[in-house]
Design a protein with these regions (language model features):
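Membrane-interfacial helix-loop segments of redox and metal-homeostasis proteins
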Residues: 1-141
């Protein structure tokens, strides 16, 4: 793994920390039934039927995914090359799901949650980082 690839994985780990903090906060608020302070219409989004899957908060599922990405990105940074594939196998679906959830906010709920958008931005950033790392690896061949 080149120095650039390690830096990309380190940045991915940092982005995963941001996503984990965000989704962890939303999960705790959801489970406690607390109000989320937000400048946008978070209550409409977080109170919608799309906020949980089978009683499990979507943010909680995201938090678990961010823990997986964080762990794999750290392992990749430490030289475990196969961990890069784990990062990619989580980051790409996370970005796709996030795009779907943005669609739900825009066209079904007609409200946006800044915290949810932050998580989506983190997921999309992770996917871009993974694709960048992949392109660097291909170019090195």
């Amino acid at each position: 793994m080149t120095r650039r690839q390690r830096i990309i994985m380190l940045v991915a780990a940092l982005v995963a920390v941001v996503g984990l903090a965000d989704s962890g906060y939303l999960t705790v608020k959801h489970l406690r039934g607390d109000y989320v302070r937000c400048d946008s219409d978070c209550s409409a989004v977080l109170g919608s039927k799309y906020a949980d899957v089978g009683g499990v908060p979507v943010a909680g599922i995201g938090a678990i995914a961010y823990v997986g990405v964080l762990t794999a990105a750290i392992l990749a940074t430490l030289g475990y090359n196969k961990a890069r594939y784990a990062v990619a196998s989580m980051a790409i679906p996370m970005a796709c799901i996030s795009l779907g959830l943005i669609y739900v906010q825009a066209f079904i709920i007609h409200s946006f949650c800044n915290y949810c958008l932050l998580s989506a931005a983190a997921c999309i950033t992770l996917a871009v980082l993974v694709l960048t790392e992949w392109l660097l690896r291909r170019r090195a061949r």
